[in-house]
């Protein structure tokens, strides 16, 4: 894409800015692997970053820092009990190196419109993890096409789509829909060790280690 940041402003950030309240009302349940990941790796000493926290639905333990680009969703997240809420961009995380024991990235990087930007975000999340730290990554998989109304994103790859919101043709979000092979390749190319991976409904997840 010729202007990926402009494309994401139009088909990602604008969507969440204009629809944050309605969207947040439909996103109250945390994704299933999130609880299992925290049960396996969280301790009372852990500091956790939710990078792209949305409305805070993954705030399941103490000492969680929530970061999101959308101010409307961050306002909703205040009620969910995050220790600290920060407006920021996953492409340039506002944290020093090796700050966190655990990182969550739930339904975030599939909104980045080029492979280079997705890998950059992954490397940023790896940067802020402590050595040996763990990360849970979730993305939408290609099977999501069977459940929503998608159209191909002009100028993108065969995995780049625009999805309508509540069947409103004038409101669309961008997604890069992953296959498992491509997701795991991204993880290893970004310097992570893959500990586990699988599927949950139309989504794919990977448990990673720095």
UniProtKB/Swiss-Prot annotation:
CDD domains: AdoMet_MTases
GO terms under biological process: methylation; tRNA modification
Protein origin, superkingdom: Eukaryota
UniProt-listed Enzyme Commission number(s): 2.1.1.-
UniProt keywords, alphabetically: Methyltransferase, Transferase
Transferase as UniProt keyword: yes
Molecular functions per Gene Ontology: S-adenosylmethionine-dependent methyltransferase activity; tRNA methyltransferase activity
First-level EC class: transferase
Keyword Methyltransferase: yes
PANTHER family, per the entry: ALKYLATED DNA REPAIR PROTEIN ALKB HOMOLOG 8
Family: Belongs to the methyltransferase superfamily.
Record's protein name: Putative methyltransferase ECU09_1500
Naturally occurring in which organism (per UniProt): Encephalitozoon cuniculi (strain GB-M1)
């Amino acid at each position: 894409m010729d202007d990926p940041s402009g494309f994401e402003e139009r088909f990602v950030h604008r969507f969440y800015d204009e629809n944050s309240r309605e969207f947040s009302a439909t996103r109250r349940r945390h994704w299933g692997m999130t609880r299992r990941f925290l049960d396996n790796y969280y301790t009372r000493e852990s500091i956790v970053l939710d990078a792209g926290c949305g409305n805070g639905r993954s705030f399941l333990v103490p000492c969680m820092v929530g970061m999101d680009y959308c101010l409307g969703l961050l306002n909703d997240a205040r009620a969910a009990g995050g220790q600290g809420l920060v407006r920021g961009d996953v492409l340039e995380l506002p944290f020093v190196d090796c700050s966190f024991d655990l990182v969550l990235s739930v339904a975030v990087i599939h909104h980045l419109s080029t492979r280079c930007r997705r890998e950059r975000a992954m490397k940023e999340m790896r940067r802020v993890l402590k050595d040996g730290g763990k990360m849970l990554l979730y993305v939408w998989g290609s099977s999501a096409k069977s459940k929503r109304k998608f159209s191909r994103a002009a100028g993108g790859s065969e995995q780049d789509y625009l999805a309508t919101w509540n069947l409103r043709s004038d409101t669309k979000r961008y997604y890069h829909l992953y296959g498992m092979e491509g997701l795991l390749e991204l993880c290893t190319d970004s310097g992570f060790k893959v500990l586990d991976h699988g599927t949950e409904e139309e989504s794919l997840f990977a448990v990673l280690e720095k």
